[in-house]
Regions:
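Bacterial N-terminal signal peptides that target proteins for export
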Residues: 1-9
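Predominantly soluble domains enriched in secretory-pathway, periplasmic, or organellar proteins
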Residues: 13-386, 397, 427-431, 436-440, ...
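Structural beta-strand segments of beta-rich domains
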Residues: 389, 398-404
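Short, flexible loop/turn segments at beta-strand junctions in immunoglobulin-like
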Residues: 406-409
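Short beta-strand segments enriched for Tyr within beta-sheet-rich domains
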Residues: 413-419
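Acidic glycine-/aspartate-rich tracts in secreted/extracellular proteins
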Residues: 423-425
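Short, aromatic- and glycine-rich surface loops/edge beta-strands on solvent-exposed regions
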Residues: 457-471
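Short beta-strand elements
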Residues: 475-486
Length: 486
């Protein structure tokens, strides 16, 4: 005697065992099958001061090479220079065949074939674009033009601009709901995120940001939540991805909160947030928002992206010229890979190289990996609990670009980064860059010059020491942080 119900249940169970697991990693939907990590995958990082894209094989955690989109200083000062400047933002197509790379200084989006690493097209948009991403159907590419007040909408095939969506001033980043219905655009200049209908490009929702500086936004694969970071006040906010788009949670994450992304594994779905001022990645559950881990990763973590199966998450270390790989089950760093200068956005593209070794059109790291690193601490002490100010000196020929991830100062106060004639900060100060701290008492500070030769000079009479002093360039006050030997 046959039992139709039992037979059906057994058939269903066997079928479910034969299918791949449906877990869904960002930016795809939760219903999308996981893609096991393999040597066909690539991790890309946009490197702001070497003007390169590093290409890493996650199966071996080794750098395959770099795609050079531009030259360092002083070559890019020429009025005849045609390369890209400040390579910064990045997204990829849903078929995983194309990455879109944003260069802030040259107002461009460069489209690169993942199989060959060849540039397919370059589109020039408005002033200081920040990020780009394809709609889930691949028909459009949205580019946040942060130096203005609109999103440039490009055709997903020709890459030409077809329309603009007016948004609050300074759009920081965009991401889409996994079903492709909504685009979420936060602002870096105004305290407002907008929700846009992808079908007709109309704004259908408004979300109040606790501060005006949002650099990054991400949507959970289940389509229920949107998380965005607030770099100036060190917070991360979560809102309902569906109408009425209300705020669900605000988390105090830490100074220089940079990017957020998600990984789903056997333990659940987790948000990973890079905290640049603490040199950490913090991990939160998305169901109850509890913090489950704090991961030390290295200097100034910035961009972050999960593997296609959620087993790993990769982090760009802006002031360490490196890529950190994290095992998401143990929440431990399992690899640190040297890459180019000051990595910003990071993307992980499963199956980016369908055949071959994927080394076409790549160059060795070379000068893109040359930099020096220093530390500044309060009163020259080792200090416990607070991360020190990290300083990177990125080689640009005979000079360097200095970038300091400054932490531990009073909020909303003027300071100056300077050179002191004595190691204890006494004597004459030579100002390099004046800055104002944000509400979290932190700042990103830049300068340029032959600084490495000065602060590492073996001749005592010519050597100078990096310090941070209160006040302005015209009237520097007391020294509050000094260069240390560690």
């Amino acid at each position: 005697m046959k039992h139709p119900l039992l037979t059906g249940l057994l058939a269903s169970a066997m079928l479910s065992c034969a299918l791949p697991a449906f877990a869904g990693q960002a930016p795809f939907a939760a219903s999308t099958p996981d893609i096991p990590l393999s040597s066909r995958d690539r991790v890309y990082a946009a490197e702001q001061f070497s003007n390169t894209i590093s290409v890493t094989n996650p199966a071996t955690n080794t750098l395959v090479g770099v795609i050079r989109l531009g030259e360092p200083q002083p070559v890019n000062f020429s009025p005849l220079y045609k390369g890209q400047v400040l390579v910064h933002g990045m997204g990829f197509s849903p078929d995983r065949k194309t990455i879109a790379v944003v260069s802030i200084g040259s107002n461009s989006v460069t489209f690169i074939d993942t199989a060959t690493n060849a540039v397919k097209h370059t589109t020039y948009v408005g002033r200081s674009p920040h990020e780009a991403f394809f709609t889930p159907d691949g028909k459009e590419v949205w580019v946040t033009v942060r130096g203005e007040d609109y999103v440039a909408v490009l055709d997903g095939t020709t890459y030409e601009e077809k329309t603009r969506i007016k948004v609050p001033n300074g759009p920081g980043m965009q991401i889409f709901s996994p079903d492709g219905k909504y685009g979420y655009v936060c602002s870096s200049f105004m305290p407002e995120t907008v929700v846009i209908s992808v079908a007709d490009h109309m704004i259908v929702g408004h979300v109040k940001q606790e501060s005006p500086f949002c650099p990054n936004i991400a949507a959970t694969p289940d389509g229920k939540q949107v998380w965005f970071t607030l770099k100036d006040i060190g917070k991360t906010q979560v809102f309902n991805a569906r109408p009425p788009f209300e705020i669900i949670k605000t988390l105090d994450t830490g100074p220089i909160t940079n990017h957020v992304n998600f990984a789903h594994n056997a333990n659940g779905t987790f948000a990973y947030v890079t905290i640049g001022g603490l040199n950490q990645v913090k991990v939160f559950r998305t169901d109850d928002f509890s913090q489950v881990a704090t991961i030390p990763v290295g200097n100034l973590p910035h961009g972050i992206w999960p593997s296609g199966d959620g087993s790993r998450i990769y982090v760009g270390l802006e002031n360490a010229d490196a890529l950190a790989g994290i095992d998401t089950l143990t929440n431990k760093v399992v690899a640190t890979i040297p890459i180019g200068q000051a990595p910003q956005a990071v993307t992980y593209v499963p199956g980016a190289v369908p055949e071959g070794d994927g080394t076409q059109n790549l160059q060795p790291l070379g000068v893109a990996g040359q930099s020096a690193h220093l530390t500044l601490r309060q009163d020259g002490a080792k200090g416990e609990g607070k991360a020190p100010t990290s300083v990177s000196l990125f080689d640009q020929g005979l000079i360097q670009i200095l970038q300091a991830s400054v932490t531990g100062l009073a909020p909303k106060k003027p300071y100056v980064l300077a050179l002191a004639s004595e190691a204890d900060g006494k004597g004459k100060l030579e100002p390099l860059s004046a800055f104002m701290t944000n509400p979290a008492g932190s700042a990103i500070v830049n300068a340029a010059g032959p600084i490495r030769q000065i602060v590492q000079n073996d001749a005592k009479a010519q050597r100078r020491y990096l310090v941070i002093a209160e006040g302005s360039s015209a009237q520097p006050g007391a020294v509050v942080q000094r260069q240390t030997s560690d």
